[in-house]
Protein backbone atom coordinates (compact mmCIF):
# COMPACT_ATOMS: atom_id res chain seq x y z
CA UNK A 1 0.00 0.00 0.00
CA UNK A 2 1.30 3.45 -0.92
CA UNK A 3 2.23 5.73 1.95
CA UNK A 4 -0.24 8.72 1.93
CA UNK A 5 2.50 11.30 1.51
CA UNK A 6 5.16 9.13 -0.08
CA UNK A 7 7.37 10.99 -2.53
CA UNK A 8 9.23 9.63 -5.55
CA UNK A 9 12.09 11.38 -7.31
CA UNK A 10 11.88 11.10 -11.11
CA UNK A 11 14.77 12.18 -13.33
CA UNK A 12 16.20 11.74 -16.80
CA UNK A 13 19.99 11.80 -17.14
CA UNK A 14 22.86 11.35 -19.55
CA UNK A 15 26.53 11.78 -18.62
CA UNK A 16 25.78 13.74 -15.46
CA UNK A 17 28.66 12.56 -13.25
CA UNK A 18 29.65 16.20 -12.67
CA UNK A 19 26.44 17.03 -10.78
CA UNK A 20 24.44 13.90 -9.98
CA UNK A 21 25.90 13.04 -6.58
CA UNK A 22 25.22 16.53 -5.21
CA UNK A 23 21.71 16.42 -6.62
CA UNK A 24 20.83 13.07 -5.07
CA UNK A 25 22.52 13.93 -1.80
CA UNK A 26 20.26 16.97 -1.49
CA UNK A 27 17.08 14.85 -1.59
CA UNK A 28 18.12 11.45 -0.21
CA UNK A 29 16.46 12.12 3.16
CA UNK A 30 13.37 13.69 1.61
CA UNK A 31 12.22 11.24 -1.07
CA UNK A 32 11.09 7.66 -0.52
CA UNK A 33 12.37 6.32 -3.82
CA UNK A 34 14.52 7.44 -6.74
CA UNK A 35 13.62 6.52 -10.31
CA UNK A 36 16.24 7.59 -12.83
CA UNK A 37 15.88 7.16 -16.58
CA UNK A 38 19.30 7.04 -18.26
CA UNK A 39 19.40 7.80 -21.97
CA UNK A 40 22.85 6.48 -22.81
CA UNK A 41 25.46 7.59 -20.28
CA UNK A 42 29.06 6.61 -20.99
CA UNK A 43 30.53 8.02 -17.77
CA UNK A 44 29.93 7.11 -14.11
CA UNK A 45 26.35 8.42 -14.02
CA UNK A 46 24.65 5.03 -13.61
CA UNK A 47 27.07 3.90 -10.91
CA UNK A 48 26.51 7.12 -8.97
CA UNK A 49 22.74 6.75 -9.23
CA UNK A 50 22.80 3.17 -7.99
CA UNK A 51 25.11 4.10 -5.11
CA UNK A 52 22.24 6.21 -3.77
CA UNK A 53 19.82 3.30 -4.10
CA UNK A 54 18.15 4.61 -7.24
CA UNK A 55 16.28 2.36 -9.63
CA UNK A 56 17.86 3.00 -13.03
CA UNK A 57 15.93 2.46 -16.25
CA UNK A 58 18.20 2.44 -19.30
CA UNK A 59 16.68 3.53 -22.64
CA UNK A 60 17.80 4.85 -26.01
CA UNK A 61 17.38 8.61 -26.34
CA UNK A 62 13.95 9.13 -27.99
CA UNK A 63 14.77 12.69 -29.15
CA UNK A 64 11.86 13.87 -27.02
CA UNK A 65 12.24 15.08 -23.43
CA UNK A 66 8.60 14.48 -22.56
CA UNK A 67 8.72 10.86 -23.68
CA UNK A 68 11.81 10.26 -21.57
CA UNK A 69 10.35 11.99 -18.51
CA UNK A 70 7.06 10.14 -18.83
CA UNK A 71 8.86 6.78 -18.76
CA UNK A 72 10.06 7.78 -15.31
CA UNK A 73 6.58 8.91 -14.23
CA UNK A 74 5.15 5.57 -15.38
CA UNK A 75 7.64 3.75 -13.14
CA UNK A 76 7.18 5.55 -9.80
CA UNK A 77 5.41 3.78 -6.94
CA UNK A 78 4.73 6.64 -4.51
CA UNK A 79 1.60 8.86 -4.68
CA UNK A 80 3.62 12.05 -5.20
CA UNK A 81 6.49 12.86 -7.57
CA UNK A 82 9.32 15.37 -7.45
CA UNK A 83 10.87 15.98 -10.88
CA UNK A 84 14.45 17.24 -10.97
CA UNK A 85 17.36 17.65 -13.34
CA UNK A 86 20.80 16.41 -12.39
CA UNK A 87 22.22 19.94 -12.28
CA UNK A 88 19.74 20.97 -9.58
CA UNK A 89 19.81 20.67 -5.80
CA UNK A 90 17.05 21.00 -3.23
CA UNK A 91 17.78 23.82 -0.78
CA UNK A 92 18.15 22.09 2.59
CA UNK A 93 16.04 24.66 4.45
CA UNK A 94 13.07 23.85 2.21
CA UNK A 95 12.98 20.07 2.74
CA UNK A 96 10.35 20.19 5.49
CA UNK A 97 8.10 22.46 3.43
CA UNK A 98 8.22 19.97 0.58
CA UNK A 99 7.30 17.04 2.82
CA UNK A 100 4.46 19.01 4.41
CA UNK A 101 3.06 19.85 0.98
CA UNK A 102 2.69 16.21 -0.02
CA UNK A 103 1.51 14.94 3.38
CA UNK A 104 -1.05 17.76 3.71
CA UNK A 105 -1.75 18.73 0.10
CA UNK A 106 -3.66 21.85 -0.90
CA UNK A 107 -3.36 21.20 -4.66
CA UNK A 108 -2.78 18.37 -7.13
CA UNK A 109 0.45 19.86 -8.45
CA UNK A 110 2.79 22.62 -7.37
CA UNK A 111 5.04 25.18 -8.99
CA UNK A 112 8.33 25.55 -7.11
CA UNK A 113 11.16 28.07 -7.43
CA UNK A 114 14.06 27.28 -9.76
CA UNK A 115 16.95 29.55 -8.79
CA UNK A 116 19.45 29.62 -11.66
CA UNK A 117 22.98 30.63 -10.70
CA UNK A 118 25.35 32.17 -13.22
CA UNK A 119 29.09 32.76 -13.49
CA UNK A 120 28.81 35.88 -11.33
CA UNK A 121 27.23 35.36 -7.91
CA UNK A 122 24.98 38.40 -8.30
CA UNK A 123 23.50 37.20 -11.60
CA UNK A 124 20.67 35.05 -10.33
CA UNK A 125 17.30 34.49 -11.97
CA UNK A 126 14.25 32.73 -10.61
CA UNK A 127 11.30 31.04 -12.24
CA UNK A 128 8.37 28.97 -11.04
CA UNK A 129 8.03 25.57 -12.71
CA UNK A 130 5.71 22.63 -12.07
CA UNK A 131 7.94 20.00 -10.49
CA UNK A 132 5.79 18.41 -7.75
CA UNK A 133 2.62 16.55 -8.68
CA UNK A 134 0.41 13.61 -7.85
CA UNK A 135 1.44 10.35 -9.50
CA UNK A 136 -1.69 10.37 -11.64
CA UNK A 137 -1.84 8.84 -15.14
CA UNK A 138 -3.34 12.03 -16.56
CA UNK A 139 -0.36 14.10 -15.48
CA UNK A 140 2.20 13.56 -18.19
CA UNK A 141 4.65 15.95 -19.80
CA UNK A 142 4.05 17.41 -23.25
CA UNK A 143 6.53 18.92 -25.71
CA UNK A 144 9.72 17.44 -27.15
CA UNK A 145 11.77 20.18 -25.41
CA UNK A 146 11.06 22.57 -22.51
CA UNK A 147 8.50 19.97 -21.57
CA UNK A 148 5.68 21.19 -19.38
CA UNK A 149 2.67 19.92 -17.42
CA UNK A 150 0.34 22.91 -17.35
CA UNK A 151 -1.96 21.80 -20.18
CA UNK A 152 -2.23 18.29 -18.74
CA UNK A 153 -3.22 19.72 -15.36
CA UNK A 154 -5.91 21.90 -16.94
CA UNK A 155 -7.24 19.10 -19.16
CA UNK A 156 -7.50 16.78 -16.14
CA UNK A 157 -9.43 19.39 -14.15
CA UNK A 158 -6.79 19.38 -11.44
CA UNK A 159 -5.52 22.23 -9.30
CA UNK A 160 -2.12 23.91 -9.43
CA UNK A 161 -0.62 25.56 -6.35
CA UNK A 162 2.61 27.34 -5.55
CA UNK A 163 5.26 26.32 -3.02
CA UNK A 164 8.09 28.40 -1.63
CA UNK A 165 10.48 25.49 -2.18
CA UNK A 166 13.74 26.15 -4.02
CA UNK A 167 15.89 24.14 -6.38
CA UNK A 168 19.24 25.71 -7.25
CA UNK A 169 20.10 25.20 -10.91
CA UNK A 170 23.68 25.22 -12.22
CA UNK A 171 23.01 24.27 -15.82
CA UNK A 172 23.18 27.82 -17.17
CA UNK A 173 26.72 28.41 -15.98
CA UNK A 174 28.66 29.39 -19.10
CA UNK A 175 31.18 26.58 -18.75
CA UNK A 176 28.42 24.00 -18.45
CA UNK A 177 26.44 25.39 -21.38
CA UNK A 178 29.55 25.31 -23.56
CA UNK A 179 30.43 21.76 -22.54
CA UNK A 180 26.97 20.46 -23.29
CA UNK A 181 26.42 22.52 -26.44
CA UNK A 182 23.04 23.07 -24.88
CA UNK A 183 21.81 26.07 -26.83
CA UNK A 184 22.46 24.50 -30.23
CA UNK A 185 20.70 21.31 -29.15
CA UNK A 186 17.77 23.34 -27.87
CA UNK A 187 17.52 25.37 -31.06
CA UNK A 188 17.27 22.32 -33.28
CA UNK A 189 14.61 20.66 -31.13
CA UNK A 190 12.60 23.86 -30.75
CA UNK A 191 12.62 24.59 -34.47
CA UNK A 192 11.32 21.07 -35.06
CA UNK A 193 8.57 21.59 -32.47
CA UNK A 194 7.53 24.94 -33.94
CA UNK A 195 7.36 23.38 -37.41
CA UNK A 196 5.04 20.69 -36.05
CA UNK A 197 3.03 23.09 -33.87
CA UNK A 198 3.22 26.57 -35.43
CA UNK A 199 0.60 28.00 -33.05
CA UNK A 200 2.14 26.73 -29.82
CA UNK A 201 2.76 29.95 -27.90
CA UNK A 202 4.98 28.32 -25.29
CA UNK A 203 7.32 26.74 -27.86
CA UNK A 204 7.48 29.94 -29.88
CA UNK A 205 8.50 31.88 -26.78
CA UNK A 206 11.15 29.31 -25.90
CA UNK A 207 12.52 29.49 -29.44
CA UNK A 208 12.66 33.29 -29.20
CA UNK A 209 14.55 32.92 -25.92
CA UNK A 210 17.03 30.57 -27.57
CA UNK A 211 17.56 32.91 -30.51
CA UNK A 212 18.17 35.76 -28.05
CA UNK A 213 20.68 33.65 -26.14
CA UNK A 214 22.65 33.02 -29.33
CA UNK A 215 22.57 36.69 -30.42
CA UNK A 216 20.11 36.05 -33.27
CA UNK A 217 18.13 39.12 -32.30
CA UNK A 218 16.23 39.66 -35.56
CA UNK A 219 15.00 36.07 -35.43
CA UNK A 220 14.07 36.51 -31.76
CA UNK A 221 12.02 39.60 -32.68
CA UNK A 222 10.12 37.80 -35.44
CA UNK A 223 9.34 34.77 -33.29
CA UNK A 224 8.34 36.96 -30.31
CA UNK A 225 5.89 38.81 -32.55
CA UNK A 226 4.40 35.52 -33.71
CA UNK A 227 4.06 34.29 -30.15
CA UNK A 228 2.45 37.48 -28.84
CA UNK A 229 -0.22 37.38 -31.56
CA UNK A 230 -1.33 34.09 -30.02
CA UNK A 231 -1.51 35.38 -26.46
CA UNK A 232 -3.03 38.09 -24.27
CA UNK A 233 -1.96 39.96 -21.12
CA UNK A 234 -4.00 37.50 -19.06
CA UNK A 235 -1.66 34.63 -19.92
CA UNK A 236 0.99 33.90 -17.26
CA UNK A 237 3.60 33.67 -20.02
CA UNK A 238 2.68 36.95 -21.72
CA UNK A 239 4.96 39.08 -19.52
CA UNK A 240 7.88 36.74 -20.24
CA UNK A 241 7.34 36.92 -23.99
CA UNK A 242 7.09 40.71 -23.77
CA UNK A 243 10.41 40.97 -21.93
CA UNK A 244 12.09 38.70 -24.48
CA UNK A 245 10.66 40.88 -27.26
CA UNK A 246 11.85 44.10 -25.61
CA UNK A 247 15.33 42.74 -24.87
CA UNK A 248 15.67 41.59 -28.47
CA UNK A 249 14.62 44.99 -29.81
CA UNK A 250 17.14 46.72 -27.55
CA UNK A 251 19.98 44.45 -28.65
CA UNK A 252 18.96 44.91 -32.28
CA UNK A 253 19.41 48.68 -31.94
CA UNK A 254 15.73 49.63 -31.61
CA UNK A 255 15.56 51.20 -28.11
CA UNK A 256 12.54 53.43 -28.80
CA UNK A 257 10.46 50.49 -29.98
CA UNK A 258 11.70 48.44 -27.02
CA UNK A 259 10.46 51.17 -24.68
CA UNK A 260 7.02 51.23 -26.33
CA UNK A 261 6.76 47.47 -25.80
CA UNK A 262 7.72 47.87 -22.15
CA UNK A 263 5.22 50.68 -21.62
CA UNK A 264 2.50 48.42 -23.02
CA UNK A 265 3.59 45.80 -20.52
CA UNK A 266 3.55 48.31 -17.65
CA UNK A 267 -0.05 49.27 -18.42
CA UNK A 268 -1.17 45.65 -18.27
CA UNK A 269 1.08 44.57 -15.37
CA UNK A 270 2.23 47.61 -13.35
CA UNK A 271 3.62 45.41 -10.57
CA UNK A 272 5.90 43.38 -12.83
CA UNK A 273 9.19 44.97 -11.81
CA UNK A 274 11.06 43.61 -14.83
CA UNK A 275 9.19 45.96 -17.19
CA UNK A 276 10.31 49.02 -15.23
CA UNK A 277 13.87 47.78 -14.84
CA UNK A 278 14.24 47.09 -18.55
CA UNK A 279 12.77 50.51 -19.32
CA UNK A 280 15.50 52.00 -17.13
CA UNK A 281 18.13 50.04 -19.06
CA UNK A 282 16.67 51.28 -22.35
CA UNK A 283 16.56 54.90 -21.18
CA UNK A 284 20.12 54.67 -19.86
CA UNK A 285 21.27 53.47 -23.27
CA UNK A 286 19.42 56.44 -24.77
CA UNK A 287 21.38 58.70 -22.35
CA UNK A 288 18.17 59.87 -20.67
CA UNK A 289 19.79 59.63 -17.24
CA UNK A 290 17.06 61.31 -15.21
CA UNK A 291 14.26 59.28 -16.77
CA UNK A 292 16.26 56.09 -16.36
CA UNK A 293 16.79 56.85 -12.68
CA UNK A 294 13.04 57.37 -12.25
CA UNK A 295 12.38 53.91 -13.71
CA UNK A 296 14.90 52.29 -11.38
CA UNK A 297 13.38 54.12 -8.41
CA UNK A 298 10.01 52.71 -9.42
CA UNK A 299 11.59 49.25 -9.17
CA UNK A 300 12.57 49.97 -5.56
CA UNK A 301 9.01 51.11 -4.82
CA UNK A 302 7.54 47.90 -6.25
CA UNK A 303 10.17 45.52 -4.88
CA UNK A 304 10.75 42.04 -6.26
CA UNK A 305 7.97 40.90 -8.59
CA UNK A 306 5.53 38.61 -6.80
CA UNK A 307 3.20 36.03 -8.33
CA UNK A 308 4.93 35.78 -11.70
CA UNK A 309 6.53 32.73 -13.29
CA UNK A 310 9.96 34.34 -13.67
CA UNK A 311 11.84 37.47 -12.66
CA UNK A 312 15.38 38.81 -12.61
CA UNK A 313 16.33 38.46 -8.95
CA UNK A 314 17.60 41.67 -7.37
CA UNK A 315 15.91 44.23 -9.61
CA UNK A 316 13.61 45.22 -6.76
CA UNK A 317 16.69 45.96 -4.66
CA UNK A 318 20.44 45.91 -5.16
CA UNK A 319 20.49 45.86 -8.97
CA UNK A 320 18.31 48.95 -9.20
CA UNK A 321 20.34 50.67 -6.48
CA UNK A 322 23.46 50.06 -8.56
CA UNK A 323 21.74 51.39 -11.68
CA UNK A 324 20.64 54.53 -9.80
CA UNK A 325 24.27 55.04 -8.80
CA UNK A 326 25.27 54.82 -12.46
CA UNK A 327 22.66 57.44 -13.35
CA UNK A 328 23.95 59.72 -10.58
CA UNK A 329 27.50 59.35 -11.89
CA UNK A 330 26.40 60.30 -15.40
CA UNK A 331 24.71 63.40 -13.93
CA UNK A 332 27.89 64.40 -12.09
CA UNK A 333 26.62 63.45 -8.63
CA UNK A 334 29.50 61.31 -7.37
CA UNK A 335 28.65 61.67 -3.67
CA UNK A 336 25.07 60.52 -4.22
CA UNK A 337 26.34 57.65 -6.36
CA UNK A 338 28.72 56.54 -3.61
CA UNK A 339 25.88 56.45 -1.09
CA UNK A 340 23.81 54.20 -3.38
CA UNK A 341 26.78 51.94 -4.07
CA UNK A 342 27.38 51.46 -0.35
CA UNK A 343 23.74 50.44 0.11
CA UNK A 344 24.12 48.12 -2.88
CA UNK A 345 27.01 46.13 -1.40
CA UNK A 346 25.28 46.06 1.96
CA UNK A 347 22.31 44.34 0.32
CA UNK A 348 24.42 42.10 -1.91
CA UNK A 349 28.11 41.93 -0.92
CA UNK A 350 28.90 39.76 -3.95
CA UNK A 351 27.91 42.47 -6.43
CA UNK A 352 31.42 42.98 -7.73
CA UNK A 353 30.52 45.71 -10.22
CA UNK A 354 29.43 47.93 -7.33
CA UNK A 355 32.76 47.48 -5.54
CA UNK A 356 34.65 48.45 -8.68
CA UNK A 357 32.46 51.52 -9.12
CA UNK A 358 33.33 52.54 -5.55
CA UNK A 359 37.04 52.30 -6.40
CA UNK A 360 36.44 54.53 -9.43
CA UNK A 361 34.64 57.19 -7.39
CA UNK A 362 37.29 57.14 -4.66
CA UNK A 363 40.22 57.23 -7.06
CA UNK A 364 42.97 59.34 -5.50
CA UNK A 365 42.05 58.24 -1.97
CA UNK A 366 44.38 56.02 0.03
CA UNK A 367 43.29 52.40 0.38
CA UNK A 368 42.88 53.02 4.09
CA UNK A 369 40.39 55.77 3.30
CA UNK A 370 38.59 53.48 0.86
CA UNK A 371 38.39 50.79 3.53
CA UNK A 372 37.02 53.22 6.10
CA UNK A 373 34.35 54.32 3.64
CA UNK A 374 33.29 50.77 2.78
CA UNK A 375 33.16 49.92 6.49
CA UNK A 376 30.30 52.39 6.80
CA UNK A 377 28.24 49.75 5.01
CA UNK A 378 30.05 46.40 5.26
CA UNK A 379 31.97 45.07 8.25
CA UNK A 380 35.62 44.03 8.11
CA UNK A 381 34.85 40.32 8.34
CA UNK A 382 32.34 40.59 5.49
CA UNK A 383 34.83 42.53 3.37
CA UNK A 384 37.48 39.84 3.86
CA UNK A 385 35.04 36.96 3.32
CA UNK A 386 33.65 38.52 0.15
CA UNK A 387 36.95 39.40 -1.50
CA UNK A 388 38.43 36.03 -0.57
CA UNK A 389 35.79 34.23 -2.65
CA UNK A 390 36.56 36.09 -5.88
CA UNK A 391 38.95 34.61 -8.45
CA UNK A 392 41.67 36.76 -9.98
CA UNK A 393 41.45 39.91 -7.87
CA UNK A 394 42.47 43.11 -9.61
CA UNK A 395 45.02 45.44 -8.00
CA UNK A 396 42.45 47.48 -6.08
CA UNK A 397 40.65 44.41 -4.76
CA UNK A 398 43.90 42.75 -3.71
CA UNK A 399 45.11 45.92 -1.99
CA UNK A 400 41.78 46.34 -0.16
CA UNK A 401 41.87 42.71 1.00
CA UNK A 402 45.39 43.12 2.36
CA UNK A 403 44.45 46.38 4.03
CA UNK A 404 41.41 44.79 5.69
CA UNK A 405 43.46 41.85 6.97
CA UNK A 406 46.10 44.21 8.36
CA UNK A 407 43.42 46.20 10.17
CA UNK A 408 42.00 43.04 11.74
CA UNK A 409 45.48 42.04 12.92
CA UNK A 410 46.03 45.50 14.41
CA UNK A 411 42.70 45.31 16.21
CA UNK A 412 43.52 41.85 17.57
CA UNK A 413 46.90 43.04 18.85
CA UNK A 414 45.23 46.04 20.46
CA UNK A 415 42.63 43.78 22.04
CA UNK A 416 39.75 45.46 20.26
Predicted regions and their residues:
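Acidic helix N-cap motif at the loop->helix transition within catalytic regions
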Residues: 18-21, 43-52, 93
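Short, well-formed alpha-helical segments that are part of the catalytic scaffolds
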Residues: 10-33
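Short aromatic/hydrophobic "clamp" motif used to bind/position activated sugar donors
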Residues: 81
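A conserved acidic beta->alpha catalytic loop
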Residues: 26, 38-50, 61, 85
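Catalytic-site signature of metal-activated, phosphate-bearing donor transferases
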Residues: 67-73, 84, 90-222
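Conserved donor nucleotide-binding strand/loop of the catalytic core
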Residues: 46-71, 75
Amino acid sequence: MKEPGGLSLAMIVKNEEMFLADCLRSVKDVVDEMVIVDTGSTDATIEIARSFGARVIEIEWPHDFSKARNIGLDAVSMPWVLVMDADEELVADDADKLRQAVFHPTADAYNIRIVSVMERAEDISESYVTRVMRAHPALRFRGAIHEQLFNAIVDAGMSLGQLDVRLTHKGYLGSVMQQRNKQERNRILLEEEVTKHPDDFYMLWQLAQTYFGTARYDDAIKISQRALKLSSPNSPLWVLAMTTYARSLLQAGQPKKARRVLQEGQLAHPKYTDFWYLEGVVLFQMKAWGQAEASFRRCLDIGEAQGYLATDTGIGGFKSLYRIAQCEIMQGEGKNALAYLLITIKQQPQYRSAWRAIFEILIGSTMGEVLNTIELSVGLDQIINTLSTWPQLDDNEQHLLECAKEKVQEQNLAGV
